[in-house]
Amino acid sequence: MDNQKEEILQKIEEAEYVLVGLGQEFDMEFFLQSREDYRRIREQLQQQNVLWLLPYVEAQFRKQYMPEMEAEIEKGLQKLAKVLEKKSYFVVSSSMNHKLAEVPWKKMLLKKERFVAPCGDWTKKQCPDGCEEGIQTVTEADEEQLQESFKKLQTNGFSVPDLGKCPKCGKKLVLNNVYAGRYDEKGYLKTWTEYQNWLQNTLNHKMVLLEIGEGNRFPTIIRSPFERIALFQQK
């Protein structure tokens, strides 16, 4: 294991560009699925057509039942960010675990964000119909609503949190993630464009691809693009 770690660090040191993919395993769904209460709540969210609440529900389960594991993962990612800070790098994630976004993914001196999560999470809210004015940051009052809703779910109850209304159409806002009926992708598009521009600059340069914890839930975000990038880099 130590030899493998040293080999990876050496490859990163020698590379001009580093692309990191953080996958769905950071949601810890495998461990969550072992809990009957999690499976019950997830099924209830599906039945009520409010699966957009799932990223918040999963965050609460991790906080309650897996705090040590999540803290260890966060510590490891902070170390990775420190290793990468002198490199030209980008991190793309298919996970909806907001803890990944809280890691200081910034390039030294430039202090520019180097992280994009196209699936969203629970920290922004949107109009269910995708109105332009809909995307907003979740407030402390919203978090209280989310917490109240989660507590009811834990006791076999149910309520949809009141996250406010869309200023344009008046419909109740939902969390901005891929489980929203009409996912408003404007929440991440600016950083995604920066990521695509960064990728264009990597052609014909020495590059390392580091894929961690990815599965097949959303293969178009990490798995398939990484395979294509690796193929182009070999040519």
Q: What residue spans do the PLM features occupy?
A:
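Conserved catalytic alpha/beta core of Sir2/sirtuin-type deacylases, generalized to analogous enzyme cores
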Residues: M1-K235
